[in-house]
Amino acid sequence: MMSGTPQFNPTDPTGGRPSHLRWYILSLLFFATTVNYLDRIVFSVLIPVIREEMHISNQEYGYINGAFQAAYTVGFLFMGRFIDRIGTRIGYAVAITWWSLAAAFHALTGSPLNLGFWRGMLGLGESGNFPAAIKSVAEWFPKRDRAFATGLFNAGTNVASMVGPPIIVAMLGLWGWRACFLVTASLGFLWLILWLMSYQLPHVHPKVSKAELDYIQSDLAEDSEEAKIGWLAALRYKQTWGFALAKFLTDPVWWFYLYWLPPYLYDVRGFNLKEIGWALPVVYLMADVGSIGGGWLPGYLMRRGWPHGKARKATMTMFACLMPIAAMSALAPSSVLAIALVSLATSSHQGWSANLFTTTSDVFPKNAVASVTGIGGTMGGLGGFLFSAIIPGFVVTYFGYTPLILGFGFFHLTALLIVHRLLGDMKRITL
């Protein structure tokens, strides 16, 4: 039996050396996800400065974020199906070109309305990242490695949130806030060159050895080609709804911290912009730990004989149970304790998310993964639109941050019940 750690022959039977190309492909997914989140967080890091220049209220800030979320929600539906139809290589390239152009145009805005428009355009493009990345993982990794691979590329969200703020603050001091958008947008075009030069499916890639291809295709029988399905057809399956409803409930928690943590630290905890720039990396470093650790744990349990569904749900249960503890950050008497508990929240969410994303490739064949991921992303975007953009703008204005932070502590536990009921033991379905 093949273990979770790849075993290669000393030499490739075809005469070449054993390759490890799937890890290079994964590094490109990590790079794209990092760029995706850099383009996304620039606005929230710079909002104290932009807010003063454009006189943006908390409610207007919520509406601007809502424009991103609404577009992201709609885009997810169509991007998933688009990527399943056109293929990962071209689909991913189209998505990153779109969002990089939209990110660059933020530099030309002069009013809240302009910002809202370009945030919406950014959301449409960025909605393609996760359907494409999840599909790439399904194409390049056997099932036992997919949660770990997902956790690794998903760590790009945290790396962006960790290294981005101090770099953005430094660029702000040197060149002003408009240049920050141009610099981060340019990274997408650099990635595009590397991607188009490198990405092909494993069985036709000239640099993949036979040993690596055999490993990638070790569960090929289970992943046999089936007819492509659209999102309307996918909605007939309760497993699709289990994934989508879990995304609806838990994605807003991450979005809330992404959007509102900088103004929370500024308005409530009294941080200045430089202090925010150094506090956020701590929060998202711990999110990296959760993402990678959460991806590694179910694979470890599977190698010890656990069924994959049981291993996946045990890991998700652990992270869901940590979220109410993390929500106590709203009541923390000191800023240090508050940052520690927020770090627990981001870490636990990312550990949860790495496993939730992987349920799509656990349960659905490869030809449906991007479509189902797109449906889930749409529901996650809808939840984010309501619970991290529109509602917080009102609640923060009239009641403060505390009710929101405490309430979000229980969203993952509710989602866990839905996952248990609708995804069950996470066995592969036949379309």
Which residues fall in each region the model found?
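Extracytoplasmic gate region of multi-pass secondary transporters
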Residues: 43-44, 237-294, 349-353, 357, ...
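Structural signature of the two symmetry-related core transmembrane helices
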Residues: 90-104, 310-327
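Cytoplasmic helix-loop-helix junction between adjacent transmembrane helices
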Residues: 118-158
